[in-house]
C-alpha cells in the first residue's frame, strides 16, 4: 500500500484546518504591513512607509529598528538564519544563508540582525551569469533590500527580497530593471491622468496575475527517466494510446491524490501571502493550473517564483514530481503561464476598465490606444521576452499562441475605434440577456464580446492577457518590456497633448491617426490558422519562430535607444542579457543532446538488442521443436527491429557529429543558430527512430516508463 499522506511536519498541522481558519494562516509567515504596524514604533513605521510608497531614502537608524523587529518576529516563527533572496539572470531565485548568532565576550551566542545586514549584502557576483559585465576575478556584487516586497520566513530562514547589482552598478538581476520600468510607467501615466484633470493620483501601479500551468507525475516513475531528471522534459517517448483526444481532462473531476496535493499547496502558499485563488485540471492528462489574484507586478513576480518553488517541494511530499517545463511530453499540450496585466492608481482605479460606455470614455480610449501603439511598434521585444529553448516547442503548435504578435480587442472596442477612424456613429448594441431555454435557469447577462483563446495578447474586460509565456519563465522580463513600451507611448502622447487647447478634440484626432497607423496589429480571428500566418505576413507583422531568430532584435538600435531613454538598461546591460539568453539556449540544447546520446547508447540499444535476441531464440526454439511451426511473426519483427537499430546507430553518429561541429562555431548568435539548425534537427531524427522502436519493443525490455505510465500514473 502506497503511503499517500500529503505532508509532513508543519503541513500536517493545518492539512485538515477548516476554511474559517484561512484568514488566520494567510500571510502568517510574512512580515507584512500588519506585522510592521504591530512591532515598529509609530515614527519608524511612518518613515518606512514613506520609503515604500514614495521612494524616500531609509535612514540607518530606522533600518536598525526595522531589522531588530524583523529578526524578533522571524525567530518567533522558527527562523535561525536570514538570506538576501534575489533573482539573478538565471531566471530562478538565489539565496545565501547567514545565521543570526553572534558571539559574546563570555563565549556564548546571541541573536542579532543589524540595519546594515538588512539593507545590503555582498554575494559573489562572478559565479552568476553576467554576459561580460563581470570577469571571473571581479567577484564583488551587492544585494539591496527591496522594501516594497515583504520579507517572509521559509524553511526556518528569514528571506529578504533584494535587487542584485555589480560592484560598478550594473543590474545583474531581473528585479532591478523591473522596478525601473514600474517607476517609468508610473511617471508617464501620471502625465496622461493630469490631462484629464486627475490631481489626486500620486502613483500608477502595474498589476499582474500569473496563471501557472504544470504537470504532476509519480516520483518513482520520474526517477527512472534520465531525460526528465537532467532536462525536465522527455527526449524519447512514443505517444500513449490515449492522450487528450476525448477532451475529458480539462475542468474534469480532480482525482483524490491530486486534490490532496492542491489542498496542501494552497495552505503553504497562503501562509506566504500568495493569493492562490483558482485550481483545476488542464487539457492534457496529468496537467493542472493554479491562478492567483492579481497584485503589484514586483510582488507578483516574487510570488510566482515562490509558487514554482513550493509546487515542486509539496509535490515531493506527496510522492510526485511537479514538471514546469514548457513541453515535457510530445503529442499533448505543453504548459504556459498567462500574464494578466493591468494599470491601477494608488486611489484604487483600474485604468483599463472601459466603464459602462467605453465610447464616451476618452481617457480609457487614449490609454488603450497607447497599448495598441506600443505592442505594434515593439512586437519584437514582446516576442523575445518569452523566448526560450523550452517555449520554442509550444508557440505555434495549435496549443499556444503563434510566434506572431497580435492583439484581440473584441467586437465592441474594435467597432468603437473603427467609428473614430471613419468619423461615423458607433451603434451601441446595449446589454443582451441570454435565454437559456428553461424556466429553472436564470437569464444571464451576455458580455459585450467573446473570448479568443488563440490570441497572444487579448483584452479580457479590464486587463490584457499576455498568453505567450512559457510555464518555467520568470515573469519579470515580459513585464519589463510591457511597462517600458507602454511608458514610451504614454510619453509620446503626453508630449503632444499637454499643449492642446481643446483636449478632447486633440485626443480624438490622436486616436484616429494612431489607430489608422497601428490597427494592423489587431486580429480578432483564429490565430492558429494557416490563413492568419499569410495574412500577418501581408500586414508586415513579425513571425519570429525560434529563440535565436527573436534574440537578434534585443540589440537593435531602436530597442537599445528605448531602454536607455527610459533608464531601464544601459547599453552594456542590454548586450549582457542578449548574450546570457543565447548562451543558456545553447547550453540547454547541449545538455539535451548529451542526455539523448547517453540514453540511446547505454539503455535503448542494449534493451532492443536483448529483445531481438529473445525473439531469435524463440524462433530457433520453434524450429528445433518442429519445422512446421510458423515463425513469421518473430522473423518479421527481428527484421524490422534490426533495420531500425541500424538506422538508430546512424542517427546517433549524426548527432555526435553535429555536436562536434559546435567547436568550430564562433559567436553566441552563430552558435545558437547552429544548435537550432543542426543539433536540434539531429535530435529530432534520433527521437523519431527511437519512438518507432519503442512501439515495436516489449515493455519488458524497454528501459523507461512509457508515456501512458507517466501521464496516468498519478491516478492509480
Spans of model-derived segments:
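Glycine-rich, acidic/polar active-site loops that bind/position phosphate-bearing ligands
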Residues: 139-324, 333-336, 343-579
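Flexible inter-domain linker/hinge segments
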Residues: 15-34, 187, 191-193
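Active-site-proximal loop/turn and secondary-structure-junction residues that shape catalytic pockets
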Residues: 62-66, 86-88, 116-117, 164, ...
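Single conserved hydrophobic/aromatic residue that forms the stacking wall/gate
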Residues: 1-17
Amino acid at each position: 500500500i502506497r503511503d499517500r499522506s500529503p505532508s509532513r511536519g508543519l503541513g500536517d498541522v493545518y492539512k485538515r484546518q477548516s476554511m474559517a481558519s484561512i484568514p488566520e494562516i494567510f500571510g502568517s509567515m510574512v512580515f507584512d504591513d500588519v506585522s510592521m504596524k504591530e512591532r515598529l514604533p509609530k515614527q519608524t513605521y511612518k518613515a518606512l512607509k514613506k520609503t515604500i510608497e514614495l521612494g524616500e531614502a531609509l535612514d540607518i537608524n530606522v533600518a536598525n529598528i526595522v531589522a531588530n523587529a524583523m529578526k524578533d518576529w522571524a525567530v518567533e516563527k522558527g527562523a535561525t538564519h536570514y538570506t538576501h533572496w534575489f533573482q539573478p539572470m538565471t531566471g530562478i531565485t538565489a539565496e545565501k544563508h547567514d545565521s543570526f548568532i553572534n558571539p559574546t565576550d563570555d563565549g556564548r551566542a546571541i541573536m542579532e540582525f543589524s540595519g546594515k545586514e538588512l539593507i545590503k549584502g555582498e554575494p559573489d557576483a562572478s559565479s552568476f551569469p553576467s554576459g561580460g559585465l563581470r570577469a571571473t576575478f571581479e567577484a564583488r556584487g551587492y544585494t539591496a533590500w527591496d522594501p516594497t516586497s515583504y520579507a517572509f520566513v521559509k524553511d526556518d530562514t528569514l528571506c529578504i527580497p533584494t535587487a542584485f547589482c555589480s560592484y560598478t552598478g550594473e543590474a545583474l538581476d531581473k528585479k532591478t530593471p523591473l522596478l525601473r520600468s514600474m517607476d517609468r510607467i508610473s511617471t508617464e501615466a501620471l502625465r496622461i491622468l493630469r490631462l484629464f484633470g486627475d490631481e489626486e493620483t500620486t502613483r500608477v501601479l502595474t498589476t499582474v496575475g500569473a496563471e501557472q500551468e504544470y504537470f504532476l507525475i509519480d516520483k518513482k516513475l520520474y526517477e527512472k527517466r534520465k531525460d526528465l531528471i537532467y532536462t525536465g522534459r522527455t527526449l524519447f517517448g512514443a505517444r500513449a494510446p490515449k492522450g487528450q483526444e476525448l477532451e475529458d481532462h480539462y475542468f474534469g473531476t480532480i482525482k483524490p491524490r491530486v486534490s490532496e496535493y492542491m489542498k496542501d499547496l494552497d495552505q503553504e502558499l497562503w501562509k506566504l501571502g500568495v493569493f492562490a485563488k483558482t485550481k483545476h485540471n488542464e487539457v492534457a492528462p496529468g496537467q493542472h493550473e493554479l491562478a492567483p489574484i492579481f497584485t503589484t507586478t514586483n510582488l507578483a513576480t516574487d510570488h510566482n517564483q515562490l509558487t514554482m518553488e513550493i509546487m515542486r517541494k509539496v509535490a515531493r511530499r506527496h510522492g510526485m514530481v511537479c514538471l514546469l517545463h514548457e513541453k515535457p511530453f510530445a503529442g499533448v499540450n505543453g504548459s504556459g503561464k498567462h500574464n494578466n496585466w493591468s494599470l491601477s492608481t494608488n486611489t484604487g482605479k483600474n485604468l483599463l476598465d472601459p466603464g459602462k460606455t467605453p465610447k464616451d470614455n476618452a481617457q480609457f480610449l487614449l490609454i488603450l490606444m497607447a497599448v495598441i501603439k506600443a505592442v505594434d511598434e515593439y512586437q519584437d521585444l514582446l516576442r523575445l521576452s518569452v523566448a526560450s529553448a523550452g517555449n520554442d516547442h509550444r508557440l505555434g503548435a495549435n496549443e499556444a499562441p503563434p510566434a506572431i504578435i497580435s492583439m484581440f480587442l473584441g467586437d465592441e472596442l474594435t467597432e468603437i475605434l473603427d467609428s473614430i477612424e471613419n468619423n461615423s456613429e458607433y451603434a451601441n448594441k446595449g446589454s443582451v440577456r441570454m435565454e437559456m431555454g428553461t424556466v429553472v435557469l436564470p437569464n444571464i447577462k451576455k458580455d459585450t464580446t467573446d473570448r479568443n483563446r488563440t490570441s497572444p495578447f487579448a483584452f479580457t474586460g479590464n486587463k490584457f492577457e499576455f498568453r505567450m509565456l512559457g510555464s518555467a519563465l520568470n515573469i519579470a522580463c515580459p513585464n519589463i518590456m510591457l511597462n517600458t513600451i507602454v511608458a514610451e507611448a504614454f510619453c509620446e502622447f503626453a508630449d503632444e497633448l499637454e499643449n492642446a487647447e481643446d483636449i478632447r478634440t486633440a485626443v480624438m484626432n490622436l486616436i484616429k491617426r494612431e489607430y489608422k497607423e497601428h490597427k494592423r496589429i489587431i486580429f480578432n480571428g483564429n490565430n492558429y490558422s494557416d490563413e492568419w500566418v499569410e495574412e500577418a505576413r501581408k500586414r508586415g507583422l513579425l513571425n519570429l519562430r525560434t529563440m535565436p531568430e527573436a534574440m537578434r532584435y534585443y540589440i537593435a538600435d531602436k530597442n537599445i535607444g528605448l531602454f536607455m531613454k527610459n533608464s531601464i538598461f544601459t547599453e552594456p546591460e542590454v548586450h549582457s542579457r542578449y548574450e546570457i539568453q543565447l548562451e543558456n539556449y545553447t547550453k540547454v540544447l547541449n545538455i539535451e543532446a548529451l542526455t539523448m546520446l547517453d540514453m540511446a547508447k547505454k539503455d535503448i540499444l542494449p534493451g532492443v538488442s536483448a529483445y531481438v535476441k529473445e525473439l531469435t531464440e524463440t524462433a530457433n526454439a520453434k524450429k528445433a521443436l518442429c519445422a512446421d511451426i510458423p515463425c513469421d511473426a518473430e522473423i518479421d519483427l527481428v527484421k524490422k527491429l534490426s533495420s531500425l537499430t541500424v538506422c538508430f546507430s546512424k542517427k546517433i553518429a549524426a548527432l555526435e557529429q553535429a555536436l562536434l561541429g559546435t567547436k568550430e562555431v564562433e559567436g553566441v548568435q552563430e552558435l545558437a543558430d547552429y544548435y537550432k539548425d543542426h543539433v536540434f534537427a539531429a535530435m529530432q531524427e534520433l527521437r523519431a527512430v527511437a519512438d518507432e522502436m519503442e512501439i515495436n519493443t516489449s515493455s519488458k525490455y524497454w528501459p523507461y516508463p512509457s508515456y501512458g505510465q507517466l501521464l496516468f500514473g498519478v491516478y492509480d
